[in-house]
């Protein structure tokens, strides 16, 4: 590592720490010649991902573009900057773990929607309206109705169905006892 002060290539590591959720290592170094201290960061170099857009053009995956879109959707909600950063990191990690080096913008949009759906419904609707190119109020109403339907389906308590099964078992055993 070259010293930023004297350009000497000999330095020693004084301290190493994991940063950014284990995505990089921060190293505190000391130049062996001039004795100045400086910090370096070591990151994993990812293979670039190409994004295939709707118009069939390609561009390199841009993390900051993803972050901007999610920040915009989460404005004036209770979603914290750390939660947004976590979502971006998780999406980026999923893209990097994929064996494919080319992904469509629609696939990225669907990933964002999955995370925002769990994080905040308002942010989900905002992102969906831009991503889905809503043309009018009908598109919003359809999406809201779909959210409400999913909410109703997921709110059916498993305890309720268990209680129903127990009641059936009790009825069956009482019938057996009555017939004995």
From Swiss-Prot:
Cofactor-binding details, from the entry: Binds 1 zinc ion.
Give yes or no: UniProt keyword Transcription regulation.
Answer: yes
Q: Which domain of life is it from?
A: Bacteria
unnamed zinc finger span: 3-34
Keyword annotations for this protein, in alphabetical order, are: ATP-binding, DNA-binding, Metal-binding, Nucleotide-binding, Repressor, Transcription, Transcription regulation, Zinc, Zinc-finger
- Function as written in the Swiss-Prot or TrEMBL entry: Negatively regulates transcription of bacterial ribonucleotide reductase nrd genes and operons by binding to NrdR-boxes.
Annotated Polar residues bias:
171-180
**GO biological process terms held by the UniProt record:** negative regulation of DNA-templated transcription
To which species is this protein native?
Gloeothece citriformis (strain PCC 7424) (Cyanothece sp. (strain PCC 7424))
Record-linked Pfam families: ATP-cone, Zn_ribbon_NrdR
The annotated region (Disordered) lies at: 148-180
The protein depicted here goes by the name Transcriptional repressor NrdR
Q: Which GO terms describe its molecular function?
A: ATP binding; DNA binding; zinc ion binding
- The answer, when asked if Nucleotide-binding is one of the entry's keywords, is yes
Cofactor(s) the protein needs = Zn(2+)
What positions does the domain ATP-cone occupy?
A: 49-139
Query: What protein family is recorded?
Result: Belongs to the NrdR family.
């Amino acid at each position: 590592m070259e010293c930023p002060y004297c350009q000497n290539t000999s330095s020693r590591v004084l301290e190493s720490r994991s940063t950014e959720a284990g995505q990089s290592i921060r190293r505190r170094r000391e130049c062996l010649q001039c004795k100045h201290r400086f910090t370096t960061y070591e990151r994993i170099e990812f293979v670039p991902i190409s994004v295939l857009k709707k118009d069939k053009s390609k561009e390199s995956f841009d993390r900051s573009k993803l972050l901007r879109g999610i920040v915009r959707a989460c404005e004036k909600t209770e979603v914290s900057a750390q939660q947004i950063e976590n979502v971006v990191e998780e999406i980026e990690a999923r893209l990097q773990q994929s064996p494919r080096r080319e992904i469509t913008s629609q696939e990225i949009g669907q990933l964002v929607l999955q995370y925002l759906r769990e994080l905040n419904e308002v942010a989900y609707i905002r992102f969906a309206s831009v991503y889905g190119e809503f043309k009018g109020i009908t598109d919003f109403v359809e999406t809201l109705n779909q959210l409400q339907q999913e909410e109703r389906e997921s709110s059916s308590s498993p305890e309720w169905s268990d209680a129903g099964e127990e009641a059936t078992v009790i009825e069956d055993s009482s019938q057996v006892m009555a017939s004995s």
